[in-house]
From Swiss-Prot:
This is Heat shock factor protein 4. The lineage of its organism: Eukaryota, Metazoa, Chordata, Craniata, Vertebrata. Phosphorylated mainly on serine residues. Phosphorylation on Ser-298 promotes sumoylation on Lys-293. It comes from Homo sapiens (Human). The modification Phosphoserine is found at S298. One of its GO terms (biological process) is lens fiber cell differentiation.
Amino acid sequence: MQEAPAALPTEPGPSPVPAFLGKLWALVGDPGTDHLIRWSPSGTSFLVSDQSRFAKEVLPQYFKHSNMASFVRQLNMYGFRKVVSIEQGGLLRPERDHVEFQHPSFVRGREQLLERVRRKVPALRGDDGRWRPEDLGRLLGEVQALRGVQESTEARLRELRQQNEILWREVVTLRQSHGQQHRVIGKLIQCLFGPLQAGPSNAGGKRKLSLMLDEGSSCPTPAKFNTCPLPGALLQDPYFIQSPLPETNLGLSPHRARGPIISDIPEDSPSPEGTRLSPSSDGRREKGLALLKEEPASPGGDGEAGLALAPNECDFCVTAPPPLPVAVVQAILEGKGSFSPEGPRNAQQPEPGDPREIPDRGPLGLESGDRSPESLLPPMLLQPPQESVEPAGPLDVLGPSLQGREWTLMDLDMELSLMQPLVPERGEPELAVKGLNSPSPGKDPTLGAPLLLDVQAALGGPALGLPGALTIYSTPESRTASYLGPEASPSP
């Protein structure tokens, strides 16, 4: 008996074709729809002639919809691509509204190739692409670390913002404090240096140098005055003399008879105790006050007296020498002698328009012209003492040019306690100090220009005018000092 041949392994049956591809194959091969959809001449693609009519007339017969866009999307899902011809690729729209699609496995007459047409499936993640737990944990740790760094950075940023605001507020405060300190320093500088820049015309808080002449080897103590009111009648004349109290005893101390002493006195120093001046009716006597004063004996028993020059706007305070008998003074006042009380003034000075007007003087009250001392004072007052004194240490303020000069003072034996010339206003009558400059040719070289004082005496009787009461003598020309002032220069 013959054995049957072994059965060959059967090939697997054809895979089922998707319904969309079967319907599309039938639709394209149907001759009744060639006017709307057909094969291309090459047979590798198919054409859709009129898309709108195709969507309305053909699609509902094979599909459940009549949407051309859905039909095109399904073709793309199976791998069909739209063929763009040269006509359709231009900018101008072609006359025929048709579209062509093609697929390598969709060919006319080869239906078996439809099995190769597969629907595009989204790519699935393989095992290698999945997250492993350890990787996920590491990633979460890194995210948490980044979040912590971010939080710390934000906290630091907030702190920096707060510090920045605080610093700006401090800067504003410091600017305000700096401006206030700058203004205060400016005011202080103005108060300190303003009077110096303003010049001598401003007498307001400016400390002016004052010169005081006193006899002795050291600077004298402040002048002591007897408490005695001045009569109102005596203040009517620019210069007057008031008798001292009976108990006043003055004398020169032996150790203070060396010569005059010049010391610095502040302008705003308080007035001597006990001195009272009645104010002038015209209010102008408050400027410039020259005092001819006396110093009583010191508690130790040594009497001190001297000439004190304290200029206030070119005015001077003069301390009188020890007293002499009253008879000599009365003889002078009664006119006993070879002079007239008004003679020297009328002979040497031009007649002023005002009773108090005095000829023009220098910046410190010195007259510019020379006058003969013989014509200004009576002979009894023109007897200089034989002794001479040298200026003490305080003369150093006058400059080195005045050191070593000698001065002689006339001994006036007059009992008087206070001689005060009142100058009503600056620029009006002032105390004329004929300077301690060298005499002009033809005059006595041992005799300096006199210090003229208009004196009104009050010796128990009516007040009498006295044109001259004091003369300061200087040594010969080679040893004569110029006027006591920092601006003066020694006479040639």
